[in-house]
Amino acid sequence: MQRKLIEIERRYDELTQLLSDPEVIGNQSEWQKYAKAQAGMTDIVEAFREYSEVVKHLEETQGLLEEKLDPEFKEMAELELEELTEKRDELEEKMRILLLPKDPNDDKNVIMEIRAGAGGEEAALFAGDLYRMYTKYAEQQGWRTELLSASYTDIGGFKEIIFLIEGQGAYSKLKFESGVHRVQRVPTTESGGRIHTSTTTVAVLPEAEEVDVAINPNDLRIDIFCSSGPGGQSVNTTQSAVRITHVPTGTVVSCQDEKSQLKNKEKALRVLRARLLERAQEEAMGELASERRSQVGTGDRSERIRTYNFPQGRVTDHRIGLTLHRLDSILLGELDEVINALITTDQAERLKSEA
């Protein structure tokens, strides 16, 4: 690990010099390329430099303890040695995590798809709860959200809702949300007060750029129709809604939320690109996935990952055995404790597999 860290630090210093070179400054695209590369190394280089300082002080303190010291000074040196040893171990762990191979999608924006599953209207209402939970979480992170497509039910739920979350590290934090979310509560329509169990499926896709997925226009069938609202009523007498079918894969995306046909087409293409990228990545990762099953989850949409129990005010993530008794705040977007626990578990698993 030490040799690798020294190489990274050397390259970081080279990039620092290049970024102040007048020729590089004059070439904006080259300067941006070097700046991005350097930014990706900053955390690990800072940790390594701090680690080097700690090790230096640790050796000095150990040297002091080998000399004859008065009892009070010796006690102080032993305490400092203990603190420095703890700090060194923490930094070693941090550097091992920072050296783990990075998911190439981690810096991408997210296209999130939420669909009502078993439970009829109650599942559709819960889909709305999850949509609000994720948009509030995004707001707390300083991210931007944009509705791409929605299919409403008569009482204000969603059969399906697709939206974009745009911001630094969005995919890295939200990727473990894919799967089946189960809700246990008494529906508002239930007169007997019985608890019902319903499910909603969440899919988290990294937003694909045009360079990530090449789509041949000849492979697309585009249908135009009038948009409709809850209960199928007509919202718009003009044909502004768009349905795009990618013929080779049979992937279909519809969008009708904008009044402009062009905007609906643009949004539908964004969702289509994300789905095609996911499909390609699933095929490429198929063999690896069968060899290594992560405790945090495979990202399979059919995997039950979390239960929201309203009578007990409880949220349980089944993958890591985490139970929190603060359902209300979680539904208000306070997801950090859950998300950080999932990220930590994933990192621990990857460290174990790298060992």
From Swiss-Prot:
The keyword Acyltransferase is annotated on this UniProt entry: no
Protein name (Swiss-Prot/TrEMBL): Peptide chain release factor 1
Residues with PTM N5-methylglutamine: 233
Similarity annotation: Belongs to the prokaryotic/mitochondrial release factor family.
Source organism: Desulfitobacterium hafniense (strain Y51)
GO cellular component terms, semicolon-separated: cytoplasm
Compartments in which it is found: Cytoplasm
PANTHER family for the chain: LD18447P
Keyword tags: Cytoplasm, Methylation, Protein biosynthesis
Lineage: Bacteria, Bacillati, Bacillota, Clostridia, Eubacteriales
Signal peptide region: none
NCBIfam families in the record: prfA, PRK00591.1
Primary role: Peptide chain release factor 1 directs the termination of translation in response to the peptide chain termination codons UAG and UAA.
Gene name for this UniProt entry: prfA
